[in-house]
Amino acid sequence: SNKKDYRKEIVDKHNALSRSVKPTASNM
């Protein structure tokens, strides 16, 4: 359960970064 929360946090941060840089987000 701890790992899931940790992973979700990373995904949230990654999503936030992707939102900041839309051009690079499409490459991923």
Curated annotation (Swiss-Prot):
Q: Does the keyword Disulfide bond apply?
A: yes
**Basic and acidic residues bias: start-end ranges:** 1-15
Expression across tissues: Expressed by the venom gland.
The organism sits in which domain of life? Eukaryota
**Gene Ontology molecular functions:** calcium channel regulator activity; toxin activity
Could you name the Gene Ontology cellular component terms for this entry? Answer: extracellular region
The primary site where this protein sits is secreted
Q: Which controlled-vocabulary keywords does the entry list?
A: Calcium channel impairing toxin, Disulfide bond, Ion channel impairing toxin, Neurotoxin, Secreted, Toxin
Its annotated function is as follows: Blocks contraction of smooth muscle elicited by high potassium-induced depolarization, but does not block caffeine-stimulated contraction. May target voltage-gated calcium channels on smooth muscle.
Please give the name of this protein.
Cysteine-rich venom protein asurin-2
- Organism this protein belongs to: Austrelaps superbus
